Amino acid sequence: NAIFAFPGVQSYHPNPEPWFAENEGGPVIDMGPYYLTALVNLLGPAKQVQGRCTKVFEEREIGIGPKKGEMFKVQTPTTYLATIQFENDCIIQITLSFDVVSHQRNHIELYGNKGSIIVPDPNMFGGSAFVSVTAGGNWGEHKTDMMPLGKINIKSQSSRANESPTNANYRGVGLSE
C-alpha cells in the first residue's frame, strides 16, 4: 500500500492555484511521480491500473503569504485511489489526496509471503527502511544515513511538515533514474 495524504498545498504555498487548475492533476502531478517511481523501482513495470478520483471542496482558502484568506476555485480532482497490478502480479493500492487533515499511515508499506517492508518517504528520498520477516511483526530498522543518498543534508527546518534536520532530502533523485 502507498499513501500520500495531507490537507493541500494551500496551507504552505502562497500561490497554490496551479495545483488545483483544470487538467493539472492535483496530487497525482504533485506527488504521484515520487510514489510511482519508488513502486516501479521496487516492483518492476505495471501491467494494469484501475482508479477513481473525486473533488471534495469547490473552493479552498490560501493559508499563507500576501493572499492569505483569499478563496480560489478548485478545478481538478483532489483525491485519487488506484489499484496497480505489476508484471510480477503484485497488487498495490495507492491513495494520493489533498483532502486528508491527518493520518498515521506509512508512506509505502509492502507485504509479501516472506515478510513486509516499510519504505522511507519517496518524496524526500531519505530515511530508514523497516523490515519484518517474522510472524507477529518484529521490525528491524535499516538505516540509510551512511549511504551516499541517505546522508542527512537538511540544515534547518523549512516549515514543511515532511522536512526536518533529522532526514535526508534528495528530492527528485528517484525520478532522475
Labelled PLM ranges:
Residues 3-8, 53-58, 88-90, 98-100, ...:
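Glycine-rich beta-alpha junction loops
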